[in-house]
Amino acid sequence: MGLIVYYSSATGNTEHFVSQLGQRLFKIDKRKPSAFVGEPYVLVVPTYADGEGRGAVPKAVIHFLNEAENRKLIRGVIGSGNRNFGRYYSLASKIIAEKCGVPCLYRFELRGTDEDVICVKKGLERFWKQLG
């Protein structure tokens, strides 16, 4: 299986979710967001936006993806968010998928559900097999 790269804030929702996937994990450190992963990965990212949708992608994730080596290795993105924010729900994953030319594989709310975890595990298994 491939690598999961993720960013999680103080709430820990994203970290909680990815810890249930049984995958190799790499956390983007907001103090050192320019670390290189060196292999293909799927990015799991929360959304943080104001009432106008600004600031949806965490700055540490922007810095991480601005490194050409990291950007060329992204294969897909999974987003988390809060449905209370309506059209801005999981906006970061949509922005990243579009800018990086990769699929948005799944979206989950807050910490996700057991069903979300099962769906993502199965989906990632199929996804990595398809990529070969």
From Swiss-Prot:
Family: Belongs to the NrdI family.
GO-annotated biological processes: protein modification process
Protein's recorded name: Protein NrdI
NCBIfam families given in the database record: nrdI
Gene for this chain: nrdI
Annotated GO MF terms: FMN binding
Domain of life: Bacteria
Organism: Bartonella tribocorum (strain CIP 105476 / IBS 506)
Role played: Probably involved in ribonucleotide reductase function.
InterPro entries per record: Flavoprotein-like_sf (IPR029039), RNR_Ib_NrdI_bac (IPR020852), RNR_NrdI (IPR004465)
Gene3D superfamilies: 3.40.50.360
